[in-house]
């Protein structure tokens, strides 16, 4: 597909991709592994989500290399993968193991996703990368372009994409069960890690087992802190993407699939104060999407840190049990149409018992509307990725057609948080109007310490 040369071409191209991936599997790919061959995986980042990703790799092939900046994590992983070569620096892994593996899993902190994935894909390696796909907006576009050019199989780690409950929800919206869509509300109970203005972290010399310079990678120099690594880096602008980046690739996923929610024209945020070091404790973000491929323009609202949609949005929706009380689900999404609403609770869109349509104040499980509704059923999110490497089917959350545009859209919310004002966005040019240098850095990173895409 040619590169769009102007805004009109860009919008047409985006609409065509969004409409076509679901049927045709998106970008044309090369199959480098036969159905009977074993896929050889190199796993980069092997604790946290890296633990489950490397285990999925083991279940769908052979893990031949493991990489982490933390020797303690490597020691633990070595017990599960005794024959795998171990590395601290992913660059050495890629150089030394080039001919010895076929695919990578990238489960590093957010700020290193793009540089690792880009280098691996440029070598012709298939890539499974954790969500959000990238730390900056441009990185998401670039990774999609590299994947398309190299014709490698890709998949982002938003596993709910493969869930039949989520896919049925999207199909019902596409079918028009609740009529013309008016607005969408999405929320999460995150953050579950410390983040707010003025929080101080204690710095120290890194333990000998932690290779801190490799952890910092392409970000600006920062002293080691046990309150950053592991896990709590999510709350720092320099390394993570906050509550929005951490969870919207899950909770925003079903509405994105159903409504092709890409390329908003403006984003505006209301949030607690923040200092540009850590993300705010809570926020509410308003995305405005234009008409696209027959889908009317609409408003999408995001809530985190305890903020919730208005009571009228949740009226008639099932509630969760909290001891003897019934309370609203602390994460989920509601799509509001002219005829009714679709309610999808939980993080991943897979709560079959409580997902359904609301007409007035009457809830009906979506399974009552499933007869005759067509959607592609997945063998499992990672299995889908492994099968696609062998030329069997397609990975839906691939970088060019799905994960990249989804991540771009989500990360625009952080742009509004940092800007502190309404952001007018030109997706074709990847430009935020009147952006400060700090805001522009969230669009296009300036890498440090010799790292690059």
Where are these regions (language model features)?
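N-terminal secretory signal peptides and thylakoid transit peptides that target proteins
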Residues: 1-18
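N-terminal Rossmann-like dinucleotide-binding module
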Residues: 14-81, 160-163, 255
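Residue-level detector of anion-binding/catalytic polar loops
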Residues: 63, 126, 153, 420-422
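Conserved SAM-binding strand-loop segment of SAM-dependent methyltransferases
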Residues: 85-89
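Short amphipathic alpha-helix with an adjacent loop that forms part of the alpha/beta core around
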Residues: 92-99
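N-terminal Rossmann-like NAD(P) cofactor-binding module of classical short-chain dehydrogenase/reductase
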Residues: 104-105
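Beta-strand-loop-alpha-helix segment that lines the small-molecule cofactor/substrate pocket
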Residues: 109-110, 114-162, 176
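Contiguous beta-strand/loop segments that form the cofactor/metal-binding neighborhood of enzyme cores
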Residues: 168, 180, 185-187, 194-354, ...
């Amino acid at each position: 597909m040619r590169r769009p040369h102007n805004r009109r071409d860009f919008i047409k191209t985006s609409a065509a991709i969004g409409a076509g991936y679901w049927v045709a599997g998106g970008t044309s790919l090369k199959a480098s592994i036969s159905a009977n061959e074993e896929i050889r995986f190199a796993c980069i980042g092997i604790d946290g989500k890296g633990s489950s990703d490397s285990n999925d790799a083991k279940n769908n092939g052979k893990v031949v290399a493991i990489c982490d900046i933390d020797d303690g994590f490597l020691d633990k992983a070595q017990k599960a993968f005794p024959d795998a070569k171990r590395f601290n620096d992913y660059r050495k892994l890629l150089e030394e193991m080039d001919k010895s593996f076929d695919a990578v899993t990238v489960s590093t902190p957010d700020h290193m996703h793009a540089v690792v994935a880009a280098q691996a894909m440029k070598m012709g390696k298939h890539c499974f990368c954790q969500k959000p796909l990238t730390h900056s907006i441009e990185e998401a576009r670039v990774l999609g372009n590299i994947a398309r050019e190299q014709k490698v199989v890709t998949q982002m780690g938003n596993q709910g994409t493969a869930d039949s409950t989520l896919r049925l929800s999207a199909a019902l919206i596409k079918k028009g069960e609740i009529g013309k869509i008016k607005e969408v509300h999405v929320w999460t109970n995150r953050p579950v890690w410390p983040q707010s203005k003025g929080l101080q972290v204690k710095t120290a010399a890194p333990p000998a087992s932690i290779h801190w310079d490799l952890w910092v990678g392409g970000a600006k120099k920062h002293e080691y802190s046990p309150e950053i690594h592991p896990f709590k880096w999510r709350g720092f602008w320099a390394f993570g993407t906050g509550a929005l980046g951490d969870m919207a690739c899950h909770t925003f996923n079903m509405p994105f699939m159903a409504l092709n929610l890409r390329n908003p024209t403006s984003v505006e945020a209301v949030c607690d104060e923040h200092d540009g070091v850590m993300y705010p404790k809570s926020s509410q973000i308003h995305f405005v999407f234009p008409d696209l491929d027959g889908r009317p323009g609409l408003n999408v609202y995001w809530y985190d840190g305890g903020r919730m949609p208005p009571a009228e949005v949740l009226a008639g929706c099932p509630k969760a049990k909290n001891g003897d009380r019934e309370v609203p689900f602390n994460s989920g999404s509601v799509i509001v149409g002219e005829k009714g609403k679709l309610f999808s609770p939980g993080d991943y869109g897979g709560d079959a018992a409580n997902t359904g349509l609301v007409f007035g104040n009457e809830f009906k499980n979506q399974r009552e509307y499933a007869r005759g509704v067509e959607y592609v059923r997945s063998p499992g999110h990672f299995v889908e990725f492994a099968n696609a490497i062998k030329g069997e089917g397609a990975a839906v959350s691939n970088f060019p057609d799905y994960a990249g545009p989804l991540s771009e859209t989500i990360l625009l919310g952080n742009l509004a948080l940092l800007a502190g004002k309404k952001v007018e966005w030109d997706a074709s040019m990847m430009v935020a109007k009147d952006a400060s240098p700090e805001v522009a850095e969230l669009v296009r990173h300036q890498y440090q310490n010799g790292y690059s895409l």
